[in-house]
Amino acid sequence: MDSSKKTEVVLLACGSFNPITNMHLRLFELAKDYMHATGKYSVIKGIISPVGDAYKKKGLIPAHHRIIMAELATKNSHWVEVDTWESLQKEWVETVKVLRYHQEKLATGSCSYPQSSPALEKPGRKRKWADQKQDSSPQKPQEPKPTGVPKVKLLCGADLLESFSVPNLWKMEDITQIVANFGLICITRAGSDAQKFIYESDVLWRHQSNIHLVNEWITNDISSTKIRRALRRGQSIRYLVPDLVQEYIEKHELYNTESEGRNAGVTLAPLQRNAAEAKHNHSTL
């Protein structure tokens, strides 16, 4: 297909990245290869958007550390970069709003890629982490331009897809908007049955043409949870995370028993918010 007729795509990965691993980076490469192989798409950008501290996940270390590690991990990539907008929000931001934010930036032509975290100093960049907070307020939605706008799609693993069924973790209207208006590129792991999960969900089945399942033939079972466990036990994580990330973790002694206890006993932000909204809606019936 003529490259001018291909749909341009921006891959967006949201998550904790606690810490970022080589597997996170592989997701982008796998998705890019798959989308290009269809002959219908041209992947022009990859975005890593770490969740903010308000997510309140157990063991989640401060966002500025996770941002810096993600910047270090993508330092040599010419197409995958880190965006700090979600991390800088005072409250937890729903994934659909992050997708919408980036789509609107592309539509209005205000996309300023490549973007770097102010916490990671580069030549000519002297801004501090706190300096960017003044720019962190959500922008008002803008009317999209009619043509030539790249499509933002959510890049994820099968675990995120299957999390759609966890009560109060996602709002049904958000799931519908994600799969209908944006689309998913899901990297499947061994042991997962993403196709069956789609079949069992009316919403996902209805929009299955906008859900791309990518088989990971070279299996890789690296996860942030396993990385943190190894670090707590004093075991090596070399070759599981980029070298610069390993050096940063060791320098700042980031993951230990104490850090794993952060937010212990605290309800995850989406569960708390969605349960409260459901209770309110029920009481008003």
UniProtKB/Swiss-Prot annotation:
Q: What is its EC number?
A: 2.7.7.1, 2.7.7.18
Alphabetized PANTHER family for the sequence:
NICOTINAMIDE MONONUCLEOTIDE ADENYLYLTRANSFERASE, NICOTINAMIDE_NICOTINIC ACID MONONUCLEOTIDE ADENYLYLTRANSFERASE 1
User: Additional comments on file?
Assistant: In strain C57BL/Ola, an 85 kb region on chromosome 4 containing Nmnat1 and Ube4b is triplicated. The N-terminal 70 residues of Ube4b becomes linked to the complete Nmnat1 protein and encodes a fusion protein located in the nucleus which is responsible for the Wallerian degeneration slow (Wlds) phenotype characterized by delayed Wallerian degeneration of injured axons.
Cofactor binding comment, as recorded: Divalent metal cations. Zn(2+) confers higher activity as compared to Mg(2+).
Q: List the disulfide bonds.
A: none
**Effect after changing W170A:** Decrease in enzyme activity. Has no axonal protective effect. Does not affect ability to promotze glutamate and aspartate ADP-ribosylation
Instruction: Explain the regulation of its activity.
Output: Activity is strongly inhibited by galotannin. Inhibited by P1-(adenosine-5')-P4-(nicotinic-acid-riboside-5')-tetraphosphate (Nap4AD).
UniProt entry keywords in alphabetical sequence: ATP-binding, Cytoplasm, Magnesium, NAD, Nucleotide-binding, Nucleotidyltransferase, Nucleus, Phosphoprotein, Pyridine nucleotide biosynthesis, Transferase, Zinc
The record's similarity note reads: Belongs to the eukaryotic NMN adenylyltransferase family.
Give the record's pathway.
Cofactor biosynthesis; NAD(+) biosynthesis; NAD(+) from nicotinamide D-ribonucleotide: step 1/1; Cofactor biosynthesis; NAD(+) biosynthesis; deamido-NAD(+) from nicotinate D-ribonucleotide: step 1/1
Identify the cofactor(s).
Zn(2+); Mg(2+)
Q: What induces its synthesis?
A: By neuronal injury.
- Source species, domain of life: Eukaryota
UniProt motif Nuclear localization signal: location: 123-129
Q: Which GO terms describe its biological process?
A: ATP generation from poly-ADP-D-ribose; NAD biosynthetic process; NAD biosynthetic process via the salvage pathway; negative regulation of DNA-templated transcription; nicotinamide metabolic process; response to wounding
Q: Which GO terms describe its cellular component?
A: chromatin; nuclear body; nucleus
Instruction: Please list where the region (Disordered) is annotated.
Output: 109-149
What is this protein identified as? Answer: Nicotinamide/nicotinic acid mononucleotide adenylyltransferase 1
The main location class comes to: nucleus
Positions binding ATP in this chain are: G15, S16, F17, H24, K58, G157, A158, D159, T225, K226, I227, R228
Q: Which GO terms describe its molecular function?
A: ATP binding; identical protein binding; nicotinamide-nucleotide adenylyltransferase activity; nicotinate-nucleotide adenylyltransferase activity; protein ADP-ribosyltransferase-substrate adaptor activity
Task: Tell me what organism the protein belongs to.
Answer: Mus musculus
* Ranges of biased composition (kind: Polar residues): 109-118
User: What does it do?
Assistant: Catalyzes the formation of NAD(+) from nicotinamide mononucleotide (NMN) and ATP. Can also use the deamidated form; nicotinic acid mononucleotide (NaMN) as substrate with the same efficiency. Can use triazofurin monophosphate (TrMP) as substrate. Also catalyzes the reverse reaction, i.e. the pyrophosphorolytic cleavage of NAD(+). For the pyrophosphorolytic activity, prefers NAD(+) and NaAD as substrates and degrades NADH, nicotinic acid adenine dinucleotide phosphate (NHD) and nicotinamide guanine dinucleotide (NGD) less effectively.
Q: Give the Phosphoserine positions (modified residues).
A: S117
